[in-house]
Amino acid sequence: MMRLLLKSLQFLYNIYAMVLFVAIMLLIFPFVILSSLAGRIKGGNMILRLCMFWSDIWFPLVFIRIKRKYESPHDKSKQYIFVTNHISYLDSAVLVKAYRQPIRPLGKVEMGKIPVFGFIYKKAIVSVDRSSLENRIASLRILRSILSKGISVLVFPEGTFNMTNEPLKDFYDGAFRLALETHTPIKPVLFLDTYDRMNHKTLFSLNPGRCRIVYLDEIPVTDLKMPDAPFLKKRVYDLMEKKLIEYNASWIQPARRLNKKNVIY
């Protein structure tokens, strides 16, 4: 009986959260349309700020607490290629809380097909169809152009949801080759709790609680060249994997997780 009651309450909570999600989106939508007239760069930055405004309203109203931890000082005025683990539908919403600076995420082209949200999505991100080599090349060309304007980019190097019990899936090469080509430092960032707040199995798994964001040490690329891309990818992967285990990320198989007394943060 109690289990049925809890499931009913979670269902009602999810309906409430989705109604708020859409209502706030519709509230900012006219301003998104106006901002889009300002062009890819200026207009995109304006739309990003509107998305930040959306997130600043939505997260408190659905009782999700964003907590940030900086393992090293983070300079918001500096340009980075951010790389983040991808474990939940909620990652897309959390990223506008995580990155409070001009930035363009690389995202799936399929999300742009959703009414209203898709329009905002396409104006705020660089879309990629990973099934098309031509489209992947075009997306990297756009990212290079954005970096040349002094704007940071965000890449989920796993490409798709990590549906395993491992800390991370294998990384694609694109972010690391782009970093070497443009001499842009990499900043790894961890989303520790988005899986717990809303796992990848269903959109109706959202629940309130904390959502931790951890900013790891910057990884410079000034002394590296293009043949070093595999080394750079492994260095970033190893660091993120190590930290996810240290922070006891909940999706990791028990044998690889730390004892509670050794968990940090």
Predicted features and spans:
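Non-catalytic C-terminal accessory region of glycerolipid acyltransferases
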Residues: L4, S8, A138-Y265
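A hydrophobic membrane-anchoring feature enriched in long, contiguous, low-charge segments
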Residues: L4, S8-L37
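Hydrophobic packing residues in well-ordered alpha-helices of helical domains and bundles
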Residues: L5-S8, L12, M46-C51, A229
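Catalytic core of membrane glycerolipid acyltransferases/transacylases, capturing the structured
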Residues: M25, V32-R49, F53, L61, ...
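Transmembrane alpha-helices and immediately adjacent membrane-cytoplasm interface residues
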Residues: D56-I66
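Generic preference for hydrophobic
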Residues: R68, F82, P105, I213-Y215
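Glycine-rich helix-loop-beta junction characteristic of Rossmann-like nucleotide cofactor-binding loops
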Residues: Y70-D75
